[in-house]
Design a protein with these regions (language model features):
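Solvent-exposed, polar/charged alpha-helical surfaces in well-ordered, non-transmembrane soluble domains
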Residues: 11, 15, 36, 40, ...
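Segments of small-molecule ligand-sensing domains
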Residues: 103-116, 120-183
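Short beta-strand and adjacent turn/loop elements
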Residues: 28-31, 35, 57-59, 68-69, ...
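Extracellular/periplasmic Venus flytrap/periplasmic-binding protein
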Residues: 1-39
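Solvent-exposed, acidic/flexible segments
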Residues: 6, 31-35, 86-90, 112-123, ...
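Extracellular/periplasmic periplasmic-binding protein-like sensory domains
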Residues: 39-117
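Active-site-proximal beta-strand/loop segments in catalytic clefts of secreted hydrolases
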Residues: 2-4, 27-32, 55-59, 78-82, ...
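Extracellular/periplasmic catalytic domains that process cell-envelope and extracellular macromolecules
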Residues: 18-20, 69, 161-164
């Protein structure tokens, strides 16, 4: 069953919830105050109903929302960026960045992109190819690249079009306080 809500209230959503089935709630907002209010209300409802929330990676940057809510509500979100901190290349980059600049590369945008890592990925993947192939880069460009922020899959819609990135990850917060990618083929 679908319950459409607006910005004003969540009071009438409970009748749509099922006690014996998982209730998937999609919150299409990047407004911190709204997302926080909805999540607080869903925490209360989750005491009586199983709830999973599909939200936004921008919520990771919201200071006023308790990160425990993400785990209690099993937050899922899609993101084109996924940093695996167990990856030796990522660990080495962070160590070298810290030694060079005196701080950790933590600045992200509202989609979860690490600016320092994006710059590094672009420098390591694109610039060497641009110097090597110059004007013929388009014909020699490798559309499947691995970077610090995950795999990059680029596709062209036509022979006269540029490349568009099509990599996407689904991230899941677990009740056990894990944060893991959901893998699919």
């Amino acid at each position: 069953m679908e319950a459409v809500q607006n910005d004003t209230a969540l009071a009438n959503i409970e009748p749509y919830f099922a006690k014996n089935d998982t209730n998937l709630v999609m919150i299409l907002s990047d407004r911190e105050e709204y997302a926080g209010e909805v999540l607080r209300n869903l925490i209360l409802l989750s005491r009586n109903y199983p709830v999973i929330v599909l939200g936004s990676p921008s919520w990771n940057n919201f200071a006023s929302i308790d990160a425990a809510y993400f785990h209690q509500l099993q937050l899922h979100y899609f993101t084109p960026y996924l940093v695996d901190y167990r990856n030796p290349d990522v660990r080495n980059f962070i160590k070298r960045f810290r030694n060079t600049f005196g701080f950790y590369p933590v600045k992200t945008n509202n989609r979860g992109m690490h600016f320092a890592m994006m710059g590094y990925d672009m420098a390591c993947m694109i610039i060497p190819q641009a110097f090597r192939y110059r004007k013929s880069l388009r014909e020699c460009f490798n559309p499947h690249l691995k970077g610090l922020q995950g795999d990059f899959r680029f596709y062209r819609s036509s022979s006269c079009a540029g490349y568009t990135r099509h990599s996407l990850y689904l991230v899941r917060y677990g009740k056990d306080y894990s944060v893991t990618p959901v893998l699919w083929e």
